[in-house]
């Protein structure tokens, strides 16, 4: 399992679990090196979901995820 930080649209609240998971999966996938693919987002820290000063309209989350090598 690995950890990263991800920014998602501020209009996605911590209570919209499926929508939030999809947004986190998209963001984490963009951050991965070309030789890795995302298996799943395991968990995220909702307390990290505050507005970010240098990214207006975004919330920052700490995300735990699993990857595997691309074929």
Feature locations, PLM:
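C-terminal edge-of-domain segments
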Residues: 51-71
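N-terminal acidic leader/helix
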Residues: 1-33
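A structural detector for beta-sheet-dominated domains
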Residues: 4, 42, 64-66
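N-terminal cationic amphipathic segment used for targeting or macromolecule association
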Residues: 4-7, 21, 49, 53, ...
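Acidic, low-complexity, intrinsically disordered interaction modules
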Residues: 27-57
């Amino acid at each position: 399992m690995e950890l990263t930080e991800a920014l998602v649209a501020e209009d996605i609240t911590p209570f919209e679990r499926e929508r939030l998971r999809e947004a986190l999966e998209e963001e984490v996938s963009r951050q991965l090196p070309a030789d890795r693919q995302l298996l799943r987002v395991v968990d995220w820290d909702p307390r990290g979901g505050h507005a970010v000063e240098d990214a207006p309209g975004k919330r920052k989350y700490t995300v735990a995820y699993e990857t595997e090598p691309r074929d």
